[in-house]
Regions:
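Catalytic core of non-heme Fe(II) oxygenases with the double-stranded beta-helix
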Residues: 76-170
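Non-heme Fe(II)/2-oxoglutarate
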Residues: 1-84, 89
Length: 170
């Protein structure tokens, strides 16, 4: 059966990495240098560290493929660590630039709070809210589904995530 490219999907897996790999990734992301990221309106999304293309050969990239898209030919466009502490307003958006067709989001480090998680819109209304739990991996087509952190909705704290955007190779 062929993949329907119009399908909207959000899926997640808890306890995605083994403990040693998660700890190593937590140590890495908390010691990176981050740069501000703003949307086209000048609003601050948060802080980002973009990894170089060499990370595409990391075993983590292969693990993501095994779990989420073993039968699709997706290739990372960008791999970055994000630090968010957004207590002002949700900044819903789609990630449809550079040919992006899918997003991977790993909740790396932060408090296990519902509002530290990510929300998804359907018909411009919040329809799904996936709370933050360390080592929770999300995979969704962020070019089709508007999404945002929901830290401004209530109790939240800073959160570190690993974000990967994918393009599809035919």
């Amino acid at each position: 059966m062929q993949h329907n490219k119009k399908t909207k999907f959000v899926m997640y897996v808890d306890d995605f990495l083994d403990e040693a790999t998660l700890k190593s990734l937590q140590d890495t992301v908390t010691n990176l240098e981050y740069q501000e990221v703003k949307n086209p309106n000048g609003q601050l999304y948060g802080m980002r560290h973009t990894f170089d293309k060499g990370i595409n050969n990391d075993p983590l990239i292969k693990l993501i493929k095994q779990y989420f898209f073993p039968h699709r030919n997706l290739e990372p466009i960008s791999v970055s660590a994000h630090l968010r502490e957004n207590n002002k307003e949700p900044l819903f958006h789609t990630d449809d630039d550079k040919g992006n067709v899918a997003n991977f989001l790993l909740f790396v480090k932060g408090e296990p709070l519902l509002n530290n998680g990510t929300g998804f819109l359907h018909n411009e209304k919040l329809s799904s809210h996936i709370g933050f739990i360390e080592n929770r991996a999300l995979f969704f087509n962020g070019s089709k589904i508007s999404h945002s952190d929901l830290q401004s909705f209530g109790d939240s704290s800073k959160r570190y995530t690993l974000n990967i955007f994918y393009k599809e190779n035919d």
